[in-house]
A protein has these predicted regions:
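Short aromatic-enriched loop/helix-cap "lid" or pocket-rim segments at secondary-structure transitions
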Residues: 18-20, 106-107, 132
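C-terminal accessory "lid"/substrate-recognition subdomains
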Residues: 1-89, 149-155
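Acidic beta-strand-to-loop metal/phosphate-binding motif
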Residues: 90-98
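Hydrophobic alpha-helical segments
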Residues: 82, 86-89, 106, 110, ...
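Short, aromatic/basic amphipathic alpha-helical patches
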Residues: 53-54, 104-114, 136
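Short active-site-adjacent structural elements
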Residues: 48, 71-73, 101-106, 126-130
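Short, flexible loop segments at boundaries between secondary-structure elements
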Residues: 10-12, 66-69, 113-145
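Short, conserved active-site loop motifs that form the nucleotide-linked donor/cofactor pocket
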Residues: 4, 91, 115-117
Length: 155
């Protein structure tokens, strides 16, 4: 017998890829129709992230790769070229937190892109209106603690 619990995923804020280098405000809402986002994804379904980015007024160009893509030097060169050809008062590269780990750890990541590269973390929100059982959070913590941990290896 299993219990069904409900949650949803939310993309939250913008975080700089390289903390010391980001010249722009970190809020999506600070982007305007004069700005452009180069959205780089290596996820199975980029549509929810695209929808979130469309909420701000900036124009969006998408570079989509397969799920769990291992970004190569050639991919980063394409990203740099595409970024160079973007129009906009401010141009930023946005990716998921998981893709950011894969991309930003590459030693061949272009230095010129570092100040303009951000990631959008994913947050899991428990739906209390559907999960009103007593002790739900305690049960959830126990279940999570029992799960084996997988670690991504840096590329």
């Amino acid at each position: 017998y299993q219990r069904m619990y409900y949650a949803r995923t939310l993309y939250v804020g913008l975080r700089p890829g390289f903390d010391d280098e980001a010249p722009y405000a970190r809020e999506r809402e600070s982007l305007t129709s004069a700005d452009t986002i180069l959205l780089v994804t290596g996820i199975a379904n980029p549509r929810p992230l695209i929808r979130v980015c469309r909420r701000c007024k900036a124009r969006i160009k998408v570079m989509h790769f397969d799920d769990h893509h291992d970004f190569s030097t050639a991919d980063l060169v394409k990203m740099e070229r595409k970024y160079a050809h973007l129009k906009g008062a401010r141009k930023v590269i946005v990716t998921t937190e998981k893709d950011a780990r894969r991309i930003l750890q590459k030693r061949f990541f272009p230095e010129a892109l570092k100040p303009y590269t951000f990631h959008m973390p994913l947050e899991i929100q428990i739906r209390p209106e559907y999960n009103a059982t007593p002790g739900f959070i305690a049960k959830l913590k126990v279940a999570i603690d029992k799960q084996p941990r997988k670690r991504e290896t840096p590329g």
